[in-house]
Design a protein with these regions (language model features):
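Positively charged, low-complexity intrinsically disordered leader regions
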Residues: 1-31, 41-43, 320
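Conserved phosphate-binding/catalytic region of the ribokinase-like
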Residues: 2-12, 203-366
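Conserved N-terminal subdomain of the carbohydrate kinase-like
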Residues: 7-8, 31-37, 57-138, 300-364
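A short acidic, glycine-rich active-site loop
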Residues: 33-44, 246
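Alpha-helix C-terminal capping segments
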Residues: 52-61, 262-265
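Conserved phosphate/ATP/ADP-binding segment of small-molecule kinases
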Residues: 158-237
C-alpha cells in the first residue's frame, strides 16, 4: 500500500520537548502543608511544542524540531502524544539521560507555579537536530529561554526567507540579546517585565524598544490585561474579556497559537489579535490544552474590546475605540451559520453585564 504523503508543515516549533503534568487547585498551600488537587491533565511542553499541538487541533499542518528524549516510558509518551495530535517531525531518543519532567500547579487566582528540568546536556541536543523541515515551512517559532541554541535555527529560516516568531518574554531587558536577535526576527512577543505588572506606558515603551531595534511586529502581552501589537504605524490594543479562571498554564502559548493561526490564514492584524486574545481567554476556563473549535473562538473574538492607535514621529496617538467588529468584516461573514453558533457560545461563556440601577430609574421617569 502506498504511503500517504503528508502536507508540508506550515508551522515549525524549535525547542524543548518534555511531558508535563498540570494540577488544578484552589490556591497554593503554605510551606510544609498540602492542598486538594481537583484535576490533573498531561500534555507536551515547552511553548514551541504546545503551539504545534494547538495548531494541529485547528487543522494547521505543524511540526516540532525538539530536544532528544530519554529511552523510557516518558519519552515514548512524548512521541506517542505528538503523533496522536498529528504533529510532524522526528522525535529523537537518547540513553544519555532520562526524559525530563515538568509539573505545573494552577490556582483559581490565575497564577501558575512550575517546576522544570532544563540541563545544558538536554538543550545541547538542539545543536544536532535536523533543520531540513524549516525551508518548506511558513513560520519558525523559537523561545529565548533556550539560549543560543535557537540561533542556528533562526539563521536557517532567514536563509530560506521563512519568517521567525520569537517568544522573548522579558529578554529585551538584555540589550546584547535584543541586538543579536533583532535582525533574525520577524514577529517578537514580549512582556514588560518578568512579573508582567507594567502599565500602559511600560507597554508602549517596550513596543517602541522592539520596533527601534528593527523588529517588524512587536507583541506585548499583559496576562489578564490583554495585549498591544505594533506593526509599522499601526497599533492594536486589545482588552481580555473577564472569564472564570481554572487553569492559566499554557495561556501565553495559546495566545501565540492564536496569533500564528491568524497570521498563517492571512488575516489583518486586528482580526489576528482578536482571535489570539479570545483563544487564550477561553483556554484558562478549563484545565489542560484541548483547544476550543475555531468557530467558538471567533464568537468570543467578536466581543473583544479594541483600541486603535498610530505610531508616528516616535509618538503614540489614539485614533478610535470600539467594542465590536464592523459588520462587513470578512472574519464575521466567512460562514454565517458558524458565526451564529460562535456568538451563541460567546454569550454562554462570557459573564453577563449587570444593568446599572440608576439607568433603569432614569428610563422609567422618561
Amino acid at each position: 500500500m502506498p504511503v500517504k504523503k503528508q502536507t508540508p508543515p506550515a508551522y515549525i516549533g524549535f525547542g524543548m520537548l518534555t511531558p508535563v503534568y498540570i494540577m488544578s487547585l484552589d490556591r497554593l498551600p503554605k510551606l510544609n502543608t498540602g492542598a486538594i488537587v481537583h484535576e490533573v491533565s498531561d500534555y507536551v511542553y515547552d511553548d514551541a511544542a504546545i503551539i504545534a499541538c494547538n495548531l494541529s487541533q485547528w487543522g494547521v499542518p505543524s511540526a516540532m524540531i525538539g530536544t532528544a528524549v530519554g529511552e523510557d516510558m516518558l519519552g515514548r509518551h512524548v512521541a506517542t502524544t505528538l503523533k496522536k495530535l498529528g504533529v510532524q517531525g522526528k522525535v529523537r531518543f537518547t540513553d544519555q539521560y532520562k526524559t525530563p519532567l515538568e509539573v505545573n500547579v494552577s490556582d483559581k487566582q490565575g497564577a501558575r507555579t512550575y517546576f522544570w528540568q532544563r540541563t545544558p546536556q538536554i538543550l545541547g541536543t538542539l545543536d544536532t537536530a535536523d533543520l531540513s523541515l524549516i525551508k518548506r515551512s511558513k513560520l519558525l517559532y523559537v523561545d529565548w529561554y533556550d539560549g543560543d541554541h535557537i540561533v542556528r535555527a533562526m539563521e536557517e529560516a532567514k536563509k530560506h526567507n521563512v519568517p521567525v516568531f520569537l517568544n522573548f518574554e522579558h529578554g529585551h531587558t538584555h540589550n546584547d540579546l535584543l541586538k543579536k536577535y533583532a535582525e533574525l526576527v520577524t514577529v517578537c512577543q514580549a512582556v514588560t517585565d518578568a512579573a508582567q505588572i507594567g502599565k500602559k506606558q511600560a507597554m508602549l515603551g517596550t513596543a517602541r524598544k522592539l520596533i527601534k531595534a528593527g523588529i517588524q511586529t512587536a507583541i506585548i502581552t499583559m496576562a489578564s490585561q490583554g495585549c498591544m501589537v505594533l506593526q509599522g504605524e499601526e497599533i492594536v490594543r486589545a482588552y481580555a474579556p473577564r472569564v472564570k479562571t481554572v487553569d492559566a498554564s499554557g495561556a501565553g502559548a495559546t495566545f501565540s497559537s492564536g496569533y500564528i493561526y491568524g497570521y498563517l490564514q492571512g488575516w489583518d492584524m486586528e482580526q489576528t489579535v482578536r482571535f489570539a486574545i479570545a483563544a487564550a481567554s477561553l483556554k484558562v476556563t478549563r484545565i489542560g490544552l484541548e483547544m476550543f473549535p475555531v468557530q467558538e473562538v471567533l464568537g468570543v473574538a467578536r466581543t473583544i474590546r479594541i483600541e486603535r492607535m498610530v505610531y508616528r514621529g516616535d509618538q503614540f496617538h489614539v485614533i478610535r475605540k470600539f467594542l465590536r467588529l464592523p459588520r462587513l468584516n470578512p472574519v464575521i461573514n466567512m460562514n454565517n451559520a458558524l458565526m451564529k453558533q460562535g456568538q451563541k457560545f460567546a454569550e454562554r461563556i462570557l459573564p453577563k453585564k449587570k444593568m446599572d440601577r440608576r439607568k433603569i430609574k432614569k428610563s422609567l421617569v422618561e
